[in-house]
Amino acid sequence: MSETADASHSPTLPLPPPKNTFQRIAGVLFAPASTFEDIARKPDVLVPMLLILVIGYINTFLMMPRMDWNAVSEAQIEAIKAKNPQMTDADLERVSRMTQAFGKVAGWFGPLFGIVWWLIMAGVLLLAFRLMGGQGTFKQALSTVLYSWIPMVIYYIVVTIVAVGRGKIDPTHMVTVVKSNPAFLVDMKEQPILFSLLSNFDVFTIWMLVLLIIGCAAFSKTSRAKAAAIVLSLWAVMILIKTAFAAMAAAKMKVKTT
């Protein structure tokens, strides 16, 4: 009787102190299960987000001078000429300048657009898991998204290194600068739909998805199998939407050239 009472009143072991941001970054790469459990207990957002943004702007600073915006504007001008051959050279020059200006502005704002994307990802994931009976808060979901984004940070660092060594790069071919997905096996202009579809199956994207599954299972208190079903279903929907847009763009270009 006394042994039972002693056992019921035995003190529980205290939880280890939460890891700092750099320990968590290393942890999601080498020990993701325990690290995401730690993130779920005490999520953090500001420091990892700032680190990703700083690295993103370093990459942008190195990449922007190497972007061949002329190639983008020339391709657009060819499409415009095919549809409106009566356009004057002055009009085409104005379109070229606007295209290049927009590309440069979008490039510098790219890392900031990432914040919007992370917020959307966190909101959609949290909603999906809550609808499926899971738990969690928005802060847990956002922290999970940020730490799961580490493989993409590594990807952009690799892309930057390759771009710096290569010189000028056509921005429309950025997805195949690093041969980490099978899209490089097809020509983007000849098979735009297949190119868009294959670009989704990237090694770094799959790595990120695996981390998302582990992290979402941790904060939502669901099984990894259920987390995988939810995350991969949402990814499949995103692929369908992206491929549909590629198909519409291809159909539009086909109409212009006929």
Task: Identify the role of each PLM range.
Residues K139-V255:
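Hydrophobic alpha-helical transmembrane segments and adjacent short intramembrane/lumenal linkers
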Residues P11-P16, F102-A106, Q191-F195:
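Short juxtamembrane and helix-loop transition motifs at transmembrane-helix boundaries
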Residues T21, S34-Y156:
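Selected alpha-helical membrane-embedding segments in polytopic membrane proteins
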Residues M1-K19:
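Low-complexity, intrinsically disordered extramembrane tails and loops of integral membrane proteins
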Residues F30, A122-L126, L209-L211:
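A generic alpha-helix surface/boundary motif
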Residues P16-G27, S96, P192-I193:
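Coil-to-alpha-helix initiation sites in intrinsically disordered, low-complexity, charged segments
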